[in-house]
């Protein structure tokens, strides 16, 4: 029988760290990563045949659950017509129309193949549109692995960026200003001093890469205000939150209109897709209409468009997001109550179909320093306890969890019963 330990050792001989994305290696929790053989509905199945209730959902895209039959049918039909053409298709226009209709802040949208491509291109576009170089990002927000965004935060209200990954030139990082997430005063201060030099703010409207941290009241509004006053471009990175926290994304949920939006994950229905779009006057700076260059061999891939279009059609059904949010609330509140009953300090954040678990005495977690102060060792033990119980959570204390339409209340209650047993041993 195949086992994950043997397969991981073999993978490490040919793939750096044995994985194609670092978080999958279980470095944040220890142990050997689970090698998955297949997935269906709310479950992933290891190579040993064990079923796990899955709250990773391929890191967000699988909002309908795995292997949804209607999505698979759409994909099969597209595959029968060919895998890639390198030419315009009806499907990519249909996707653009659908996305623009669901997100009114988008007058035009360009398809790419990953979230990193989307954020990288949006920043280049903002710089080209404004003629400015500096960008603002926030501690704990991840926007892909392009050089401008691999910059760590230091202390104080403003950090002139230092590279946090070898290979990022220091002079490039100096154009990235890093501020504390949810700190409106720091935003106003940096714009008072550098507003005329700043091309854009890029922000996860719900920070999903330091677990799940929603914006505090007034924070997103401040970003909109300072961009309006300075002429900077406001970019919402909705690669994770787009079509996940609400049908119109976090911008619809919170009622804030960005200038540009980046998308991914859900819009691909499990296939590699990204997108960026926004105001007409900005988007028309893109080649071939304008001078800001962006291109991609597989952008708008017809198979990926088929998966994404069917997914967007299904999640647009009435009450879909109301029901998803209620399921997430049921899980989040159930975990909090059971932890409290076991004497375990746990803060649970959730928005739409996202949730985050923080082992901390703090009543609310809204800042990066609070996230970093949480008990990571207790999370590690909780993760492995749940894995033994057949529940697959994100293998990192800094990643959000996801609920899908396939998670019915019986599945959620099985998860809560498992958590009750694990909490008792923590």
Swiss-Prot record:
TM annotation in the entry: none
Keyword check for 4Fe-4S: no
GO cellular component, one term: cytoplasm
Main location per the UniProt record: cytoplasm
Stored SUPFAM superfamilies: PLP-dependent transferases
Cofactor(s) this protein requires: pyridoxal 5'-phosphate
Record-listed N6-(pyridoxal phosphate)lysine modification sites: 265
Compartments where found: Cytoplasm
GO biological process: protoporphyrinogen IX biosynthetic process
Gene3D superfamilies cross-referenced by the UniProt entry: Aspartate Aminotransferase, domain 1, Type I PLP-dependent aspartate aminotransferase-like (Major domain)
Record keywords: Cytoplasm, Isomerase, Porphyrin biosynthesis, Pyridoxal phosphate
Gene Ontology terms, MF aspect: glutamate-1-semialdehyde 2,1-aminomutase activity; pyridoxal phosphate binding; transaminase activity
Record's catalysed reaction(s): (S)-4-amino-5-oxopentanoate = 5-aminolevulinate
EC category: isomerase
Assembly mode: Homodimer.
HAMAP family per the UniProt record, alphabetical: HemL_aminotrans_3 (MF_00375)
Protein family membership: Belongs to the class-III pyridoxal-phosphate-dependent aminotransferase family. HemL subfamily.
Designated name of the protein: Glutamate-1-semialdehyde 2,1-aminomutase
Gene source species: Methylococcus capsulatus (strain ATCC 33009 / NCIMB 11132 / Bath)
The encoding gene: hemL
